[in-house]
Amino acid sequence: AELKKDLTTFPTVIGDWVIDHQQNSESLVGLPDADESFVRSYRASDGRRVALSVAYTRTQRQGKELVGMGTAPLHEKADPTVLRVEEGSVPANRTIIDRGHRSIPVTFWYHINGTGYADRNLAKLATIKQAFVRGRTDGALVMVSTEPRKDDSEESWKRQEAFAAAVFPLLQEYLP
């Protein structure tokens, strides 16, 4: 399925976060076969930064799966969490991705047919169901990462997840 809106038009202001054009952003986990993707940095008024990464796949096939070998490293150290969004809650994951000597905190979920999935098996099932019911296999991997931090406090995770929760309803306007 096609995107509802072009990802390049995604908001540059989200709550008290503003796009940061100075930051060089690269995706931590690549979906090399993604049909549409973007990585953007946002900065809060207190200087905190987050990177938002969205990788959208129109169709999946063997070797080009949304949930597969490419995303397996995300799940190795993942712990479930819940994003509090306006209508309720969205399941997500917390994980740490090691890049060189840096440990990067990441909140991520799969966005399939307007629903967020943290569990990779449920995400795969949702894709299969969507293929049978709607004849499509599209979906997205959404990641919110921050700079490495010394403290792994609950408060730091909550702030990161608050940004992720603000992103979720906006994604509904873009992703099918």
Explain the meaning of each model-derived region.
Residues 131-137:
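Short glycine/proline-enriched loop/turn "hinge" motifs that connect secondary-structure elements
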Residues 1-14:
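Alpha-helical transmembrane signal-anchor/signal-peptide segments
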Residues 139-176:
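Surface-exposed amphipathic alpha-helical segments
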Residues 18-21, 25-130:
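Short, solvent-exposed recognition patches
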Residues 13, 38, 48, 138-140:
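Envelope-exposed proteins and targeting segments
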